Amino acid sequence: MKNSINASEVVNIIKEKVETFDNPIKRENIGEVISVTDGITLVYGLEKAKFGEKVSFASGVEGIVLDLDHDTAGIVVLGNDRDVKEGDVVKCSGDVVQVPVGHELLGRVVNALGDPIDDGGEIRAKNKMYIESKAPGIIDRKSVHEPLQTGIKIIDLLIPIGRGQRELIIGDRQIGKTTIAIDTIINQKKINDEVNENQKIYCVYVAIGQKISTVAKVVNKLKESGALEYTTVVVASASDCAPMQFLAPYTGCTIGEFFRDNGMHCLVVYDDLSKHAVAYRQMSLLLRRPPGREAYPGDIFYVHSRLLERAAKMSDEKGQGSLTALPIIETQAGDVSAYVPTNVISITDGQIFLESELFHKGFRPAVNIGLSVSRVGSAAQLKSVKKVAGSIKLSLAQYRELEDFAKFGSDLDATVQLSLNKGKYLIELLKQKQYSPMQIEEQVLLMYIFSNLYGQLNKVQVSNINRFECDLINYFQTVHPGVLKKLSGDMNDDIKDDILGIVSDFVTQFNCV
């Protein structure tokens, strides 16, 4: 007869199995896609989703929660929305977007999520940071006092920029806004070669909504000039979806913050925030948020202010690092009173205004000195620059005024004629070719000659000023490099006497050629 198992034995076996069961239930916050429209998905469920949380769809595509309702969530898709279908399961990650940061990203081209899109292989960064972080507080900051040299004469002399400043570059399309930013990045090459690690300026160039061919030209130019080795390029091109264009500047800022928070210096260029605002407007309207002025949502100011406020010069206790921001805004027919331009002007510490009329006249970079200002940069100017630049702005303003006045009358007194003649020389001296930044001591030399040795400069014809400028700087670099080097410090009488003698001899030789 077979042995029978009684009920108590069965109960004991079940109890033992239950107690030794080591596969705990995994709880997941999931939802279901209700609708997909132009990169925006409406998801039912996700009860514990957080604003800004990263989610993943069944196809592997990721998204970000940007709208929360009673029982639904609005999610922007970070990729192709064709891979997302109604009824798909959506899972919350429990985390917000992070991007890789560190020296490993230098020389690389990445997308808005920090993934490489060049041919350099995988980025093995040791650190990651959240793309959304609080701006440094008042106590953690220090006033701007160190110069950031752009290599552009009209900016370094008249609209100086300091490390930790936010300086807006604004103007119509195709008049040199990006060129100023790229020149500034290229100019750091010589400076970085001469200083230690903590004094180097690392750069981040963020391309938002631009053609891929345009970005490729910029990357090639940086590579040719040797500037890509200390630069990271973040790209969200015109072919990328609106959410990627929206995230790109925050990613670029986060990459720059790594250097700032570790006692180093970084320059971030946002090219441009007009397209960034358009991408955010598109997302907001699709999320059915109420439109405001020019159909932008009510929080468009906050979107830009929370980005630009992260640029700062840190205090001694926080490592003395800095993050400098050069946002770019494109205007329509020179209208700076539009919604987004006025917002960004009010957020930043000054603006460099480029004018189409000056550009077409051949005055390049086409900076309108009357409308351009740097509110904190003067505190960071070198003493020698302050001495020579003091009268330049006044001379330029007088020339512009007298130029219009001279059109109405032919009889001009000697003083007016002298101011007009000096203005013509100054205009030629302030012109600069694309991708040819100039060191600060060379700028000081040229402006000192204009301000104090006009009698010598006047011997050169206006049409020959550009050739005179190039030959003079080459002469100083090869024959008198010591004198040129001293001009980056304070200027004393001995240096002035040396310059007078050298320039007098050079002008004589130049006119004989």
Swiss-Prot record:
InterPro entries noted in UniProt: ATP_synth_asu-like_sf, ATP_synth_asu_C, ATP_synth_asu_C_sf, ATP_synth_F1_a_nt-bd_dom, ATP_synth_F1_asu, ATPase_a/bsu_AS, ATPase_F1/V1/A1_a/bsu_N, ATPase_F1/V1/A1_a/bsu_N_sf
Gene3D superfamilies for the chain: 2.40.30.20, ATP synthase alpha/beta chain, C-terminal domain, P-loop containing nucleotide triphosphate hydrolases
Protein known as: ATP synthase subunit alpha
Membrane topology: Peripheral membrane protein
Function of the protein: Produces ATP from ADP in the presence of a proton gradient across the membrane. The alpha chain is a regulatory subunit.
Keywords: ATP synthesis, ATP-binding, Cell membrane, CF(1), Hydrogen ion transport, Ion transport, Membrane, Nucleotide-binding, Translocase, Transport
EC number: 7.1.2.2
Location of the protein in the cell: Cell membrane
Higher taxonomy: Bacteria, Pseudomonadati, Pseudomonadota, Alphaproteobacteria, Rickettsiales
GO CC terms, sorted: plasma membrane; proton-transporting ATP synthase complex
Predominant location category: membrane
